[in-house]
Amino acid sequence: MLIKELITRTEKEYMIITLLKHYKVEKVKVKYKSMKDYAHYNVDTGTLELSSRYKEIKPRQMKEFLITILHEIRHAMDAKKYGWRKFKQMYEMEMNMISQGHYPGKDDPYKDNKYEIEAESFGLKNMPRWKSHFSKK
């Protein structure tokens, strides 16, 4: 039921809470913020920031929305696993190594960052399962 029509803010919050609990990062705070992307995980504050621009999610936007949320949850899982300071340090070290040319063929500190690649892969891999799960509700 959730995905057949527009996804309201309440349904969106239910989906996010379900995902946070499933991946055992339920202590992550969720807040709305004006931004272009659907979501961003702020490692400094342990906050999943959701875009206030997308009050409702259309069915055609659902895949991208779920991939993004799962991607950001992966960052939260890494922050929990390593500790937020250590994860931030590792992430920034990876960005610096790419920027300084230590990895041949890699030149974009964001897109070529192994933590971003892992998070995107996690989102793509898990999206079909959750899309199906939320479609049945």
Language-model-detected regions and their locations in the chain:
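Metalloprotease/metallohydrolase-associated module, dominated by Zn2+-dependent proteases
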Residues: 23-27, 84-137
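Zn2+-dependent metallopeptidase catalytic core
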Residues: 6-26
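Hydrophobic (often cysteine-bearing) scaffold residues that line and stabilize catalytic clefts
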Residues: 8-12, 62, 66, 111, ...
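Nuclease and nuclease-like effector domains acting on nucleic acids or nucleotide cofactors
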Residues: 1-2
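Active-site scaffold of zinc-dependent metalloenzymes
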Residues: 29-63, 76-80
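Short, hydrophobic alpha-helix immediately C-terminal to the catalytic nucleophile
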Residues: 16-17, 75, 120, 124
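Catalytic Zn2+-binding segment of zinc metalloproteases
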Residues: 72-89
